[in-house]
Amino acid sequence: MKTLWAEISCEVPVAMVDLLSDFLVELSGNGVSIENLALDTFSLETVEDSPVKTVKAYFNGDSPLGSQLDAIETFLHAHGSAFAGFVFKHPVVATIKEEDWANNWKEYFKPVRIGSRLVIKPTWEEYAAGEGDIVLKLDPGMAFGTGAHPTTKMCLEVLEMIFYGEGPYNGDGKHLDPVTVLDVGTGSGVLSIAAAKLGAERITAIDIDADAVSVAEENLALNDALPLVAVSTTALQDVPGRYDIVLANILAEELVRLAPELVDRTAPGGYLVLSGILTEKEEFVINGFGGFGLSLIERRREAEWSCLGFRLESK
């Protein structure tokens, strides 16, 4: 017997998509999708095509949905007014078969180039690599990112620039010798995979979500990167040592809360790359990392998101 799922759809402004998606993932315990786009798998050119998107969450179709619908409507009323163009609409409920929910999102995940060299491709898509391409194979599952979201994309761009000494990162165009990398909030593992393929000699990847760790391990194995990466649910304060590059793609409030530990894990002269920051909270994060001996060397922005690149003073 095929499992039936209840699909609850909510129409919101583009800027509210991430906030609502996080809430729905927590409420449902499952992945979400966006109309005509799978979460975190869109082509970047489509972000501004429409002022609104339909976010869809999935619940067990055999259980009553009254409490979930009430929670969603309360959330929309509480947060919607903060977003330009928000008009409250009642969520729409539909019933779908499990195989439709599990596979339809894949048709929207295509190979995407990030930076000058990196190409991310799903495992089910063919891609003819060009000269100099560094191909990352990914099978993210519905609840984890693919690298196309601006927060992850900017991290990947900065990571490539660091390894190749481009822009504000050394600026000499020389490839770094093997380095150590700490990936905080690894999710699908895409940043760790990129670091391994760019030449890191040792990588530590952590995430508070055990499911994310499992997905990351599978993706690392797909890319023959698992021997280089220790991935676990270890808390940041329990990670030993210091790293040449520290990457943290998490919410602004968490970045500031973890600022002392993130700086403590950064080697003198090393780079600290922070993403997951709404542009309106950029100064909040910069101020939160003041007084630690960091130099802000780059502010990168895309859509409503910011990525900050710091260098820790050598001692």
From Swiss-Prot:
Keywords assigned: Cytoplasm, Methyltransferase, S-adenosyl-L-methionine, Transferase
Gene name for this UniProt entry: prmA
Sequence similarity: Belongs to the methyltransferase superfamily. PrmA family.
GO CC terms in record: cytoplasm
Organism: Geotalea uraniireducens (strain Rf4) (Geobacter uraniireducens)
Entry-linked InterPro entries: Ribosomal_L11_MeTrfase_PrmA, Ribosomal_PrmA_MeTrfase, SAM-dependent_MTases_sf
Function: Methylates ribosomal protein L11.
Domain of life of the organism encoding this protein: Bacteria
Cross-referenced Pfam families: PrmA
Enzyme Commission code(s) on record: 2.1.1.-
Entry's localization field: Cytoplasm
Broad class of the protein's primary localization: cytoplasm
The protein, known as: Ribosomal protein L11 methyltransferase
